[in-house]
Amino acid sequence: MKLTKLFGLATLVSAVALAGCKDDKPAAAAAPQEPAARKLTVGVMTGAEAQVTEVAAKIAKEKYNIDVKLVEFTEYTQPNDALTKGDLDANAFQHKPYMDKEVEQRGYKLAIVGNTFVFPIAAYSKKIKNVSELQDGATVAVPNNPSNLGRALLLLEKQGLIKLKDPSNLFSTSIDVIENPKNLQIKEVEGSLLPRMLDDVDFAIINNNYAVQQGLTAEKDGIFVEDKDSPYVNLVVSREDNKDNEAIKDFVKAFQTEEVYQEALKHFQGGVVKGW
């Protein structure tokens, strides 16, 4: 009987001792989960511009936790159509004169979110090295879309090769040429085809993205080049209905960085100017 009592007492003491040793610290809280990455689909022109934008996409992921999917296009008419249809959240390929014309002609509801670069257009030739070598009746190929056509004509006027009815009109066409002292034959051609025309014309005015694809750079190969005061700064554009999307604004911040600028210099070899 005594042994039973002693055993019971020992058990009670052990239980109390164990209770005293119990860790009263609260359980560690679970580590907070990383917020889900935001997602953006951005349209760009294929080639060097796409490669530069890939760096912006990398920075957007690292700094702002945005997964950026780039969709590449080969024709200027495609990215705004895809944006309007909702296939893209934004695009980065056009300047304001081009966007304004698209809005006017196609009724797109677009908004500017930020600037990227000025990619100066330039005149290239396999037949002459200086504009002074141009013969009477020389043939020049220019882009055929409205804004880049006007841009090319303004560049020709700045060189004294033609005179336009209204130089302030960014959408001048061939019928607005009121003086043409060298009787230039102006051929309007789809932009992506212009580099291939160099064997058939005296010179061509080519956008930088198409020129670079053929190993041409404005700084090294251009007969004459658009300067930094051009109004044709490229843009990041959204639809009106998503222009306040914070992810798009953060993507612009990622684009407007020194790392992206240095990548652009590498691909365009001096043929690029910061737009911010």
Curated annotation (Swiss-Prot):
Function, in words: This protein is a component of a D-methionine permease, a binding protein-dependent, ATP-driven transport system.
Ranges annotated as spanning the membrane: none
Keywords: Amino-acid transport, Cell outer membrane, Lipoprotein, Membrane, Palmitate, Signal, Transport
Chief location: membrane
Keyword Phosphoprotein: no
BP GO terms, sorted: amino acid transport
Family to which this protein belongs: Belongs to the NlpA lipoprotein family.
Compartment(s) of residence: Cell outer membrane
Any Gene Ontology CC annotation: cell outer membrane
Signal sequence region: 1-20
Membrane topology: Lipid-anchor
UniProt cross-references to Gene3D superfamilies, sorted A to Z: Periplasmic binding protein-like II
Lipid moiety-binding residues (S-diacylglycerol cysteine): C21
UniProt protein name: Probable D-methionine-binding lipoprotein MetQ
Positions of N-palmitoyl cysteine lipidation: C21
One protein family per Pfam: Lipoprotein_9
Source organism, top-level taxon: Bacteria
CDD domains tied to this protein: PBP2_lipoprotein_IlpA_like
